């Protein structure tokens, strides 16, 4: 049976983890969200989230966006390639409802799966 947990090892935790992804990213994006990815050697995907106060003013909106991104990643973790992902949020994302945001994230996960080199 497939576990759908979200343990600590599935998260990017340190600035060096984020820097690693920013150096040579593979990009997939919409006007409101960009997901950067870079292959890792761990055998499983990891995610890091950046939701700037500059783009989403209210804390409860930032928390909602991060919660939906984490949940989307958690549900797709077994179909994703072994990559480190950073979810970047742009202006206008707070205007999306939960369904539209979830659909956008799913579309971006599928795009990363197609772009990933076969392993």
Curated annotation (Swiss-Prot):
A GO MF label: ribonuclease P activity
Role: RNaseP catalyzes the removal of the 5'-leader sequence from pre-tRNA to produce the mature 5'-terminus. It can also cleave other RNA substrates such as 4.5S RNA. The protein component plays an auxiliary but essential role in vivo by binding to the 5'-leader sequence and broadening the substrate specificity of the ribozyme.
Originating gene: rnpA
GO biological process: tRNA 5'-leader removal
Top EC class, one word: hydrolase
Assembly information from the UniProt record: Consists of a catalytic RNA component (M1 or rnpB) and a protein subunit.
Protein name according to UniProt: Ribonuclease P protein component
Assigned protein family: Belongs to the RnpA family.
InterPro entries: Ribosomal_Su5_D2-typ_SF, Ribsml_uS5_D2-typ_fold_subgr, RNase_P, RNase_P_CS
Organism: Yersinia enterocolitica serotype O:8 / biotype 1B (strain NCTC 13174 / 8081)
Gene3D superfamilies reported in the protein's UniProt record: 3.30.230.10
UniProt GO cellular component terms: ribonuclease P complex
Presence of keyword tRNA processing: yes
Keyword tRNA processing part of the UniProt annotation: yes
Lineage top rank: taxon: Bacteria
EC number: 3.1.26.5
Keywords: Endonuclease, Hydrolase, Nuclease, RNA-binding, tRNA processing
Reaction catalyzed: Endonucleolytic cleavage of RNA, removing 5'-extranucleotides from tRNA precursor
Annotated HAMAP family: RNase_P
